[in-house]
Amino acid sequence: MEGSMFCYQCQEAFGNKGCTSGGRCGETSETANLQERLIAELKAVALTLEGRTNVTREFSRFIVRAMSATLTDTNFNPDRIYALIDEAKRALRTLDSDVQAPDPSILSVEDTEERSYREFLIYGLKGVCAFTFHALALGYEDNAIYNFVIKALSAAAKPDTPHERLALLIVECGRIASIAMALLDEANTDTYGSPTICHIPFEAGHNPAILMAGQDLKDLEELLIQTEHAEIDVYTHGDMLTANTYPAFRRFPHLKGGYGGSWWTQAQDFASFNGVIVVNSNCIAPVQDAYRGRIFTTGMVGIKGIPHITHRHIGMQKDFSEVIALARTLPPPTEAESGPVVPGPMCGFGHNQVCSVINQIARYVESGSIRRFIVVAGEDGRDERREYYTELVKALPADTVILTAGGAKYRFNKLDLGKITGIPRIMDIGQINDAYSIIRIAMELQRALGIRTLDKLPVSFVLSWYEQKTVAVFLALLTLGFKNIRLGPTFPAFFSPGILEVLTRDYGVKPITTPEADAAAMMEGN
């Protein structure tokens, strides 16, 4: 499987065209090609399921789980991907199917326009599957999502599906993404309570410790339960920071807060942490020798040679005993390179918190105290051009409120921008998965202000895209009617000229330019 590859699903695609001999993410030609083989087998399963009735959910659950393994920065273990391919083939045999998997190569579609439409749909679908997989871990699922996943994969598998049909499915993918995010929000809040506003400290303690990175809250819950009386502290890294805002997690005194920065700073953060690291979703970078002997993966994450915590059995927890035993033997964390931050950034501005005072916020808008809301959300990455998001936030006038979700927050979440009539100018909504809260807040603000359409709200969007969850969020926003969204630091490599024409003409999608120019344009509603 070694040799050539083609992958352009993330923002780090080489030359903004595509990676052909390994990716900066750590993907090799072997794992890239295996992931494409897996998707081809999943298409065959979807083609088999399409039109059938009375089929159990187990096949849809498998598709969602397997698609989640193909997100950027998730699974670089060939053995694990081979196992998923074999599982797909077993599903076909169970279904008594003679459907053959289509050509797995992205480049097998020679027409670049058609290829772009197909891959745009697949990448949005990956984001939907990731949201759904997180909800499924908590026992929540929705047939509307499963039915769409099967329909969309089937359409992408058929060589005669016209790009007009694919375009309609891309739009529908945005609608389903909203449903998937709403489902995940319901799962999280039903299980752990609604996030509450709080400061989250970034400060190293004196006990041996475990650092959990990723976005799967169920894993953190089970780890906290298993370490409750172990005199081991637990910290969060990257997007897992949001867990500190849920009431169910805050009852654990050994959950100490955040450590380090965004997912991509993990090489330095994991090295200085000293303790054990567990990565549970799409945020793993190439593992460095400084911490190779004390990192574990779980969920759909995989790195060859790194120990893996296997799936939980029904009615049981995952077994973190090996992680805990190793943590006992290791020294406490040292301060991260960024140093301690106490009391830490304010987080927990979920829709339940913000919407409870939405009428008051609307009055501040009507009085001119708040002139505009700027949503700076999405994922972070290594690209130096992402410093734009820091400078943009600094350039925004003092009568603006910044809403953020996802790793993009780490570009500015420790800045002190003050408050407007008691409202913090930076409102951290949560993970990229929690972008649903931004949608809910916007809809409630629309109601409170009596504005007919969402695109007329005093709200501007600047998305920091990196991977497929942000693609799904982007599609959800477009489907709901938001316009003039800025997307950076670059446009996706899979945006063909035809796709770009539609996005700019019909939705007003824009590239980022300079922080000062974009800040001024957004204040004018552009």
Where are these regions (language model features)?
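Long, compositionally biased, glycine/small-hydrophobic-enriched stretches that function as flexible linkers
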Residues: E2-N207, L211, E231, G238-L241, ...
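Anaerobic metallocofactor- and corrinoid-dependent redox/one-carbon enzyme cores
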Residues: E2-S21, E27-E36, A44, E172-N526
